[in-house]
């Protein structure tokens, strides 16, 4: 773990790709040994109506072709520490106010911290309720790093907003 202090706030992040790989492997081990995790997760997602999640490989191609808008709905500090390339920072708490700035002609893919993070699920629900075509990416930045996929960093205090 690494920590970055900014006044009274401390942002913690995973120290590197090796740590991310370990985290993802540990999560996979827990999932394989504790079948209840899968059952609880699937029941929760089924109740929320967001069972499907976009496939990582398909997402990479669709982003490259400009077919989707990718939203990182985590807090801005987490986005700045590392995000999927091309993703737009739009924390869940700001999503409702910014709906008019999002493109309606493209599918929106929301992601957060990983398969057990509910931020992306809530974002997809809100987007769908407001007429958007939306789905979630169940993986987060640690999953991408663990698979050797590129992650962008933005250590400035400015936020990337959708234009």
Please place each PLM-identified region on the residue numbering:
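Rhodanese-like catalytic fold shared by cysteine-dependent sulfurtransferases
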Residues: 5-50, 80-85, 89, 93-107, ...
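Structural motif
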Residues: 70, 109-111
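A mid-sequence, solvent-exposed acidic-amphipathic segment
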Residues: 70, 74-80, 84
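Short hydrophobic beta-strand motif reused across regulatory alpha/beta modules
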Residues: 1-2
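Short hydrophobic beta-strand that contains or immediately precedes a catalytic carboxylate
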Residues: 59, 69-74, 90
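Residue-level preference for short coil/turn positions at secondary-structure junctions
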Residues: 64-66, 104-105
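A short, well-structured juxtamembrane/interface segment
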Residues: 49-64
